[in-house]
């Protein structure tokens, strides 16, 4: 294992993220179908060593392990790792779990055949550091693959809305949804990879109404929880405005009791 005793200028920000995402587990039913799509996109097969970065409740890790891969999974949030271990146990698969940070991966260079992340690594405050770490632990010729939210579509627009109403990101931290722009992804991966491929997928989220979608998200997703916490105490009228705009966005993507949340899939080979 590699030492990660490095001073982190974003330690406070990451501590807030750790707390904010601690209630995410109920959303795993939404992220489970896209997990299989990412595993397919990455071409994961039996016998490969796979790292799932920012694994959450391990829907990707367990899916890969059920296909015979040797899986390691890492997340910043202990509460999500507790549920991740439960999921692996229920599925009857072995996953090597670690509490840790994508910007300081505790693994030696060139360890894994495949490195994946589903809607997780995008929250790292320094994209250049995160992607460098993901590529560092990947073997030459190995596959890096991830799922992200395009800024112009449903969840990207919700993130932009949240940025308007919520606390600002620390100086120098870019919006997570930039990872959903193929041009940005291409630039961030740069000359370290070849065979860069993009695809699209859709997360169909069952919901009775835009208000139901908002209610669930407010109770589970870190950025939304923070907005409600701050505005309910300081500016209830602005909270009402936020909720109205949120439901208006969701209504554009709601049909037949499903919210269509499209995402970007990326795959590349490390040179």
Feature roles, as predicted:
Residues 49-105, 129:
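Class I SAM-dependent methyltransferase SAM/SAH-binding core
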